[in-house]
Amino acid sequence: MSNPVSPLSGQEPLEIERKFLIEYPDPVWLERQPGSRRVEIIQTYLLSDGSSTRRVRSWTEAGRTVYIRTCKRRLSDRTRVEVEDELSEADYLALLKEADPTRHPVEKTRWCIPCGSHVLEIDLYPFWSDQAVLEVELQSEEDEFLLPPEIRVIREVTGDPRYLNSSLARELP
């Protein structure tokens, strides 16, 4: 989710993040992390004009589902303008009619793990059993962070379009 920006500030809400391909994490380790949260996400991409990416999400945590609409516009490999709003279930279902037919819905389990002043978001996909994607949101592109030793990075994939969820949605069967 994007960094909050006051509507009175005149600034656009920015999402600044780095992304890593990691070895599939130990599920027991994920569950045991203090403050860890497990979220089931179904992400559907909507038709757009090409200047931005539009999607809707079903976000289920602890038996409660919320629906979120997101519009993203790329500024750099690490930074995007991201505008989100919560939807009613009826509005979510109506927007599904605008789904991009060239992309499949992406289902994933997201683990949110507090780590110092950051939150690690680890996405587990049903089509991968040996790797996962880790994202960390930052306050600036220069912001530094440390990953726990239990996280084994294969490589950084920030800016690699193959690891965008919107790209994965095109590759799914």
Where on the chain are the PLM-derived regions?
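Phosphate-end processing signature that detects enzymes handling 5′-triphosphorylated RNA
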Residues: 1-173
